[in-house]
């Protein structure tokens, strides 16, 4: 949005991502709409490793994603937005903003989430077509989605899948429906928020353009 010239501060177009803004006293607009400050809350993106649960506590004694937070965030009421499976890696948003978390999790928004799956063997084109069109999971058809083969050999395939739903273990179950096992799964984006170069097991605060995007959903 910033690079596209759609953001103004006090009436002046901003095109540099590193622009400093006095969020309390400046008038910020995106596509002509005033954006109210949301930086009073904390907004983080994490590269979640497998072996952690996306809850604030776990009655089975497993490690939670909050255990990965740096000390400076430990006394904040931070919680994950949505979930990644225990054995799935990748992008997870964490925040103190309950309203935003509820908005992002609501099915009506249908925010695209992109995953990269490592699958045993190759997936024939007819099966890829089935996945794109929708398959039956737990008695309910999945919505149409994007499926792209990134690379493949006789042993494994790397396949990018973009879905707009958030059903439990959806990507894994989609491949199970065509008799393929996912051996590794990583989420790489949520809408326009991308994992980027965040190292595994660490967090980074969202940039102003990323929080602006979330505020407009």
Residue ranges of model-derived segments:
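Basic, flexible Lys/Arg- and Gly-enriched helix-loop patches that mediate nucleic-acid binding at interfaces
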Residues: 1-217
